[in-house]
């Protein structure tokens, strides 16, 4: 068989084999077997040197034509197989709309936000409305209108962040409590009765410990009207504690001092860990403080636009983080501001 006959036979076999190729891996093997450096076409071309000189041009042209034919066939087959592979990939990625959907990941509210909403719900059912007041406050509203004139010793109860202001401008500070909101709520409602809660962030220049943070939330509450007495304050706080910590929770009131209330009290609940026996959490007292309260001082009522001779009122202030700590047994307030997912995902 002449070299050209062998070439014709090789071309026929190669094209026939190409028609049987079903994937790109087999196509690569076909290319190596027929068109590679050690492939069948290259091995056959080595016989060109043994031909008579007059036959070499014809045989060389035939070799070039055969190579071109096989390469063109290879390109067509490769393009077709790639289209098929893309189609298979597309079909594999298609979503079966008849299958049940995947539920999206559900986020969680921060435990402070959860406690705030619980407080809103309980006090809202008692007729209290939510008010907001500025976080950057004047010295007048943060101290003076709350019965703490300049140089009053009660100011030492709070370590204050002051804001730089131009000479002659009012002294500005980051509010140390939400009590300034009392004045805003009073002046907006006087001389009419009012029940309001004033939640928000407070700031104090304190060392950060397991019990203290420089930034924290507080909820202030006031109720003003005719013939409001300490009994109303007591009934409100006891009902609030029972809603938050469970029916039958033991409570007590202790005398205290706040410049904007008179008389002033601390409101405690029985320690839920030791049942009143005394433990590390309650400092062996058997009780846990949850808020401060009292009857609004006549000076504060007057500064809010009310006549203390005709109306009276009570006020209370609580820390949502502290109340959440008591409710969930959290021993370090710094967790609330850590952003640690291990902590937040528990709520």
UniProtKB/Swiss-Prot annotation:
GO terms for molecular function: ATP binding; magnesium ion binding; phenylalanine-tRNA ligase activity; tRNA binding. The keyword Cell cycle does not apply. GO terms for cellular component: cytoplasm. Binds 2 magnesium ions per tetramer. It is found in: Cytoplasm. Keywords: Aminoacyl-tRNA synthetase, ATP-binding, Cytoplasm, Ligase, Magnesium, Metal-binding, Nucleotide-binding, Protein biosynthesis. GO terms for biological process: phenylalanyl-tRNA aminoacylation. Its main location: cytoplasm. Its cofactor is Mg(2+). It comes from the Bacteria. It catalyses: tRNA(Phe) + L-phenylalanine + ATP = L-phenylalanyl-tRNA(Phe) + AMP + diphosphate + H(+). PROSITE patterns: AA_TRNA_LIGASE_II. CDD domains: PheRS_alpha_core. It is an enzyme of class 6 (ligase). Its EC number is 6.1.1.20. Mg(2+) binds at residue 262. Tetramer of two alpha and two beta subunits. Belongs to the class-II aminoacyl-tRNA synthetase family. Phe-tRNA synthetase alpha subunit type 1 subfamily. PANTHER family: PHENYLALANINE--TRNA LIGASE, MITOCHONDRIAL, PHENYLALANYL-TRNA SYNTHETASE. NCBIfam families: pheS. This is Phenylalanine--tRNA ligase alpha subunit. It comes from Roseiflexus sp. (strain RS-1). The gene is pheS.
